[in-house]
């Protein structure tokens, strides 16, 4: 008697997107919000122009990273800020921007407001997103905390409605 093994399929979080000078829109706005949250003075306009490029290079230098002006996995990982209910500011705006971009708020008529306040609506949207991820990737916690795994899933575009 022979036993055949079924092929193992393991879902994983999509890789971080590479973002560089000249890119526009998503996820440049999120990048700009995170740079602002790290103290860089720039306008969130969705354009990765000279000002954003300079802020990225400065951030990379401050963090001891390779200074190439390209936002890849190492820079994203250093840039993200864990946020949860009660958090406020530009990092929260970055999360909310991701939800708006992909219509992940769960409400087809009203997107999540980008107001920088991690309140009940943002918490519900985050938990719903995490629950959807958890179905395919059981290691994803459904805790309402936007940490490294949830940030990566958001920025890389794991789900859209």
Which residue stretches match the model-derived regions?
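Cell-envelope/ECM-targeting effectors and their regulatory/trafficking segments
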Residues: 1-161
